[in-house]
Curated annotation (Swiss-Prot):
Residues 19-112 bind DNA. The keyword Transcription applies. GO terms for molecular function: DNA binding. One of its GO terms (cellular component) is nucleus. It comes from the Eukaryota. SMART domains: B3. This is B3 domain-containing protein At1g43171. SUPFAM superfamilies: DNA-binding pseudobarrel domain. Keywords: DNA-binding, Nucleus, Transcription, Transcription regulation. Its main location: nucleus. The keyword Nucleus applies. It comes from Arabidopsis thaliana (Mouse-ear cress).
């Protein structure tokens, strides 16, 4: 399966202490690449925050997190991130890897 994934649809982030204790900041270039294949995303939606699904296929858990943009510069997961990070047992230094599945319209967790 991994050989078939489009690298432009992957968001990868080494988690910092700030990401663990608060909201996770996401790499701008990677998020912008994924946004090109997301349906129904608007500037207003990004500024206000919009819900996306994140599927942990190993545990068959589905999370809902809010993707938000600040000042056209920073992207992050807000609401829902806390539940997701605790369920995935993520700690500082871990690499969060997510793949945007444009056909299912959700992220797939690649941390396995």
């Amino acid at each position: 399966m991994l050989d078939e994934l489009d690298g432009a649809m992957i968001i990868s982030k080494t988690l910092t202490k700030t990401d663990i204790v608060g909201n996770v900041a996401l790499p701008k270039a990677q998020v912008m690449s994924v946004l090109t294949r997301m349906n129904g995303v608007t500037d207003e939606g990004l500024d206000n925050g919009f819900e996306v699904q994140v599927h942990d296929i190993m545990e068959d858990d589905l999370y809902t997190v809010t993707l938000k943009r600040i000042d056209d510069m920073k992207y992050y997961f807000g609401t829902g991130w806390s539940t997701m990070k605790h369920s995935l047992d993520l700690v500082e230094g871990d690499v969060l890897k997510l793949y945007w599945d444009q056909f299912e319209n959700k992220f797939i967790v690649l941390n396995f």
